[in-house]
Amino acid sequence: MPRSRINGNFIDKTFSIVANILLRIIPTTSGEKEAFTYYRDGMSAQSEGNYAEALQNYYEATRLEIDPYDRSYILYNIGLIHTSNGEHTKALEYYFRALERNPFLPQAFNNMAVICHYRGEQAIRQGDSEIAEAWSDQAAEYWKQAIALTPGNYIEAHNWLKITRRFE
């Protein structure tokens, strides 16, 4: 049974109803409809913290979805789950894959920067300043890209870039 039929959350039910209406109105192929259903069910499972179920739905959605823009959001959400699970290498891979299909995802650049910054902080705690600097430099590059795409957002990152003298 599709997740949209079992979810008790009012907002999720409302979203599901609107999404189902749009799927009937907008001319789409059955494959596109099926991909969207898996994506929607993945988002619902993810919002409830059911990451294994969300990943299953997202993987199926990526198998069916042919539009690069839509695929980018599926891949981005897979990256979010891997980030939440502490699987940073996998998360970075999925953020990269999302950006290959849609280079205008500032949130992917931001999340990549956060992971790099975290790894830099880990290196500092381990006493490896050279590795820490490399990770911090990489974080700076990703934050610059996120800020360039959405000026005025990512204020904390912008301040960090200024404080660390990495902002040009």
UniProtKB/Swiss-Prot annotation:
Coiled coil: none annotated. PROSITE patterns: TPR, TPR_REGION. Gene3D superfamilies: Tetratricopeptide repeat domain. One of its GO terms (cellular component) is chloroplast thylakoid membrane. One of its GO terms (biological process) is photosynthesis. It holds the Pfam family TPR_1. InterPro entries: PSI_Ycf3_assembly (IPR022818), TPR-like_helical_dom_sf (IPR011990), TPR_rpt (IPR019734), Ycf3/AcsC/BcsC/TPR_MFPF (IPR051685). Keywords: Chloroplast, Membrane, Photosynthesis, Plastid, Repeat, Thylakoid, TPR repeat. It is found in: Plastid, Chloroplast thylakoid membrane. SUPFAM superfamilies: TPR-like (SSF48452). It is a peripheral membrane protein. The keyword Transit peptide does not apply. It comes from the Eukaryota. HAMAP family: Ycf3 (MF_00439). Essential for the assembly of the photosystem I (PSI) complex. May act as a chaperone-like factor to guide the assembly of the PSI subunits. NCBIfam families: PRK02603.1. Belongs to the Ycf3 family. This is Photosystem I assembly protein Ycf3. The lineage of its organism: Eukaryota, Viridiplantae, Streptophyta, Embryophyta, Tracheophyta. The gene is ycf3.
